[in-house]
Design a protein with these regions (language model features):
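Conserved catalytic core of nucleotide polymerization and phosphodiester-bond processing enzymes
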Residues: 1-281
Length: 281
């Protein structure tokens, strides 16, 4: 659950965000095995990160039952974590972000939300600056490392970021040139027959999504050693056990998907799911 936000917070040491996840995870684990009438009420500090940022947007306490408000908080936490600006944030909401409802906020409110996010998540914002430096290092052939990743280049504009599983993200033919339409310089790299732009927030997104995928893929391999995995979608894994082993399979999958990998031992991971005789959400 919420794996990209968790990886982004972990990669840049946004410790308050990680602690918020730990508290909400602990509450969920505590009450999950209890009948609904025996569950204690959730405290404000046990709400998830989406609800918490919803407070900022709406100026009141947001709970999971506030579906629209929490959804907007989710869009903020996921989208703004990769350097999305106010104008794009406004357009994203108006189009129906993440398949959700269309929401129209004035630009001034979007600017306030973006500023507030960056101030509250200042270590993530600093991570974008680190990523900008990584781009420049790759272009110049300068090597470096941060936590579980390392990077370098051949000195001729071809750069790469090495991931903890041995795979790499490649950025060939990096160039910095002025974008006359936008009025500022930007980095681009060759992708097939096209040139694609790359900047701090976008490289951050690439790294976070790659690391999140590695986590889920390794979890899937652990599960597949005991129960046959039949499909995966984003951060979802589906296995096909015998009916009599369904509950055991679910418990095993839950254990696998909440266990960090060796290169990120302190990241808080969470999962939710269930079993049925047919595939459903």
């Amino acid at each position: 659950g919420q794996i990209e936000a968790r990886v982004n917070g972990w990669l840049w040491d946004q410790t308050d965000l990680l602690e918020a996840f730990r508290k909400s995870d602990a509450y969920a684990a505590e009450v999950s095995a209890l009948p609904k009438d025996q569950r204690r009420p959730m405290r404000e500090d046990e709400r998830d990160a989406y609800c918490r940022f919803g407070d900022v947007v709406y100026g009141r306490t947001i709970w999971k039952k506030d579906e629209l408000e929490r959804f907007i908080g989710k869009v903020c936490v996921l989208g703004l974590g990769f350097q999305m600006g106010a104008a794009k944030f406004q357009t994203t909401l108006a189009k129906g972000a993440l398949g959700g409802p269309r929401v129209n906020f004035p630009l001034s409110q979007c600017e306030h939300i973006v500023r507030t996010y960056r101030a509250a998540n200042y270590r993530i914002a600093e991570g974008w600056k680190i990523c900008t430096q990584i781009i420049e290092d790759m272009a110049l052939g300068v090597s470096g490392a941060h936590k579980c990743i390392s990077w370098g280049g051949d000195g001729d504009g071809n750069g790469w970021v090495l991931l903890p599983n041995g795979m790499s993200l490649k950025y060939p033919n990096l160039r910095k040139a002025r974008n006359e339409e936008k009025g500022f310089e930007e980095w681009t790299y060759q992708s097939g027959e096209m040139r694609k732009k790359i900047y701090g927030g976008l490289l951050c997104e690439n790294l976070v999504q790659a690391l999140a995928r590695i986590i889920v893929a390794e979890q899937m391999l652990m599960i597949d050693k005991k129960y046959r995995c039949v499909m995966t979608t984003h951060d979802e894994v589906v296995a096909h056990p015998k009916l009599r082993e369904a509950e055991k399979c679910y418990q095993f999958m839950y254990q696998c998907m909440t266990t960090p990998l060796w290169w990120c031992p302190d990241i808080p991971l969470a999962a939710e799911g269930g079993w049925a005789e047919n595939y459903s959400k």
